[in-house]
């Protein structure tokens, strides 16, 4: 009864309104005081001169806490008790009680408590936990207002050790695999992930009937170099999904291509085809990379491929821009037989003639499959490109009106820079290594070269919005858009571009009226 009386007197005293006393107000979304989150703040705050009233409240709170120590066990009253702790203006009492709660909880969970060094301040630091929620509920909830005031740098620094050492204290320094270098760890994890992806591709390609949908899903985020040649041949429709039929199909298609050469190539000097061959002969040395194209064997291969395709497709014939589409296929297929650090410096002098012939045939058929889907880009007046440039203008006006208006104010027309983007599929805008990565995704997308390319171009233009808005002159704007600084781009830049393009496609592809004014 004496204890009950003391408690009643305590509540009576703590609830009595004193003149000039500070009343704490908590909003609907503000949780009870969290000593873990506010320990540093309380410690750094200068203490106010202690008044007799405050000393009395501290003494009373300590008495109450000692009489009700069992209430600090994890239960439904945690929130109420933490709220009472918030009412104390003395940080030492608050932190002492919080430390006791953490020690009790650690003992119940069977985890060792952190030992504080002699030179360290007493500060409770929770142990690193995996992302999954713990079994015990501490009911220490961070409010919306508190999450907004936390420093991003601190959040980032706290997140890194959580991923690096799953169930280890923050103060522990752990060496994994004999090294503690983060770059080594990340590269090791990256190589393991790449090896795992390569195994998935190999298993899929080696099956009796390759699942093309699964192959497209895996290929969207990039194809490992060792399996890229076979994957491209399958995704382009050149080879069948059945493994047993592939050798016969390759042999038949290669023979068919060289039959075309025997039948048509000698007519390149005829008056009817002379202009076509001359234009091809002029355009090939202008292609890039020069180190590859200017090799005599490569020049002859490209001339044959382009001339045969033009003769076999009289509706369009040869149009400037088609020549660029040969390069990615040829480089990918030739890299199956030679090791090259950079695709721009491939040397074919050591490749056997028979292998080069097979690569030439494979390149012709895969390029033909690609052009079958975008042939209206190269027919008379190139209506496919005209339509896509107009669609690009409408799309950009919806997703970034400021960039669109800036181009319009300086009288820059989309045809002046985007025509080449559609005609060459961005091959003149990004390095060849980036084009190959881009085509991994194009071939895994339905109508990737004809439809998805539109959204890639929109994302590509908006990617340079800062630089575009800084240009205040027509000539400078057009010069920038025709010479974009992408020489140092790599796969990561292309992946970001493709991710943004996919977001745009998801928003607009199935609702074309959304980007029509």
Swiss-Prot record:
<feature type="modified residue" description="Phosphoserine">
    <location>
        <position position="167"/>
    </location>
</feature>
<protein>
    <recommendedName>
        <fullName>TBC1 domain family member 22A</fullName>
    </recommendedName>
</protein>
<dbReference type="GO" id="GO:0042803">
    <property type="term" value="F:protein homodimerization activity"/>
</dbReference>
<dbReference type="GO" id="GO:0005794">
    <property type="term" value="C:Golgi apparatus"/>
</dbReference>
<keyword id="KW-0597">Phosphoprotein</keyword>
<dbReference type="GO" id="GO:0005096">
    <property type="term" value="F:GTPase activator activity"/>
</dbReference>
<feature type="modified residue" description="Phosphoserine">
    <location>
        <position position="145"/>
    </location>
</feature>
<dbReference type="Pfam" id="PF00566">
    <property type="entry name" value="RabGAP-TBC"/>
</dbReference>
<feature type="region of interest" description="Disordered">
    <location>
        <begin position="103"/>
        <end position="191"/>
    </location>
</feature>
<feature type="compositionally biased region" description="Low complexity">
    <location>
        <begin position="176"/>
        <end position="190"/>
    </location>
</feature>
<keyword id="KW-0007">Acetylation</keyword>
<comment type="function">
    <text>May act as a GTPase-activating protein for Rab family protein(s).</text>
</comment>
<dbReference type="InterPro" id="IPR035969">
    <property type="entry name" value="Rab-GAP_TBC_sf"/>
</dbReference>
<keyword id="KW-0343">GTPase activation</keyword>
<dbReference type="InterPro" id="IPR000195">
    <property type="entry name" value="Rab-GAP-TBC_dom"/>
</dbReference>
<feature type="modified residue" description="N-acetylalanine">
    <location>
        <position position="2"/>
    </location>
</feature>
<feature type="compositionally biased region" description="Polar residues">
    <location>
        <begin position="163"/>
        <end position="174"/>
    </location>
</feature>
<feature type="modified residue" description="Phosphoserine">
    <location>
        <position position="132"/>
    </location>
</feature>
<feature type="domain" description="Rab-GAP TBC">
    <location>
        <begin position="222"/>
        <end position="446"/>
    </location>
</feature>
<dbReference type="GO" id="GO:0071889">
    <property type="term" value="F:14-3-3 protein binding"/>
</dbReference>
<comment type="subunit">
    <text>Homodimer. Interacts with ACBD3 and ARFGEF1. Interacts with YWHAB, YWHAE, YWHAG, YWHAH, YWHAQ and YWHAZ.</text>
</comment>
């Amino acid at each position: 009864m004496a204890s009950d009386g003391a408690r009643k007197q305590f509540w009576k005293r703590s609830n009595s309104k004193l003149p000039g006393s500070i009343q704490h107000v908590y909003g609907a979304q503000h949780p009870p005081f969290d000593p873990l989150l506010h320990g540093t703040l309380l410690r750094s705050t200068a203490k106010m001169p202690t008044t007799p009233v405050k000393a009395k409240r501290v003494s009373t709170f300590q008495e109450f806490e000692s009489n009700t120590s069992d209430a600090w066990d994890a239960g439904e009253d945690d929130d109420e008790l933490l709220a009472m702790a918030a009412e104390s203006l003395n940080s030492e009492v608050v932190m002492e009680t919080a430390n006791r709660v953490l020690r009790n909880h650690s003992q119940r969970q069977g985890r060792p408590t952190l030992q504080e060094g002699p030179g360290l301040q007493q500060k409770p630091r929770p142990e690193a936990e995996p992302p999954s929620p713990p079994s015990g509920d501490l009911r220490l909830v961070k409010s919306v207002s508190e999450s907004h005031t936390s420093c991003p740098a601190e959040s980032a620094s706290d997140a890194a050790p959580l991923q690096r050492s799953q169930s280890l204290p923050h103060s522990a320094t752990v060496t994994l695999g004999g090294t503690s270098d983060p770059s080594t760890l990340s590269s090791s994890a990256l190589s393991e992930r790449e090896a795992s992806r390569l195994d998935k591709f190999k298993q899929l390609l080696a099956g009796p009937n390759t699942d093309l949908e699964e192959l497209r899903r895996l290929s969207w985020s990039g194809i490992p170099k060792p399996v890229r040649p076979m994957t491209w041949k399958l995704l382009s429709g050149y080879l069948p999904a059945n493994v047993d039929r592939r050798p016969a199909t390759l042999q038949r298609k290669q023979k068919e291509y060289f039959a075309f050469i025997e039948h048509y190539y000698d007519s390149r000097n005829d008056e009817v085809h002379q202009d076509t061959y001359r234009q091809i002969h002029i355009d090939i040395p202008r292609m890039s990379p020069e180190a590859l194209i200017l090799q005599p064997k490569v020049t002859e291969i490209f001339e044959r491929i382009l001339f045969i395709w033009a003769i076999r497709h009289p509706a369009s014939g040869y149009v400037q821009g088609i020549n660029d589409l040969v390069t990615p296929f040829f480089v990918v297929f030739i890299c199956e037989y030679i090791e090259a650090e950079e695709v721009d410096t491939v040397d074919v002098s050591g490749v056997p003639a028979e292998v080069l012939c097979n690569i030439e045939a494979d390149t012709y058929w895969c390029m033909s499959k690609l052009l079958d889907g975008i042939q209206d880009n190269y027919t008379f007046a190139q209506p496919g490109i005209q339509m896509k440039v107009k669609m690009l203008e409408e799309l950009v006006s919806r997703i970034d009106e400021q960039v669109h208006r800036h181009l319009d104010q300086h009288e820059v027309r989309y045809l002046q820079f985007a025509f080449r983007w559609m005609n060459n599929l961005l091959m003149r805008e990004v390095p060849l290594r980036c084009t190959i990565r881009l085509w991994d995704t194009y071939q895994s997308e339905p109508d990737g070269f004809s439809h998805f390319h539109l959204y890639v171009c929109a994302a590509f233009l908006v990617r340079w919005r800062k630089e575009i808005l800084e240009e205040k002159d027509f000539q400078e704007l057009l010069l920038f858009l025709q010479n974009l600084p992408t020489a140092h781009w790599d796969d990561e830049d292309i992946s970001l571009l493709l991710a943004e393009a996919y977001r745009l496609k998801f928003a607009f592809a199935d609702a074309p009226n959304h980007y029509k004014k």
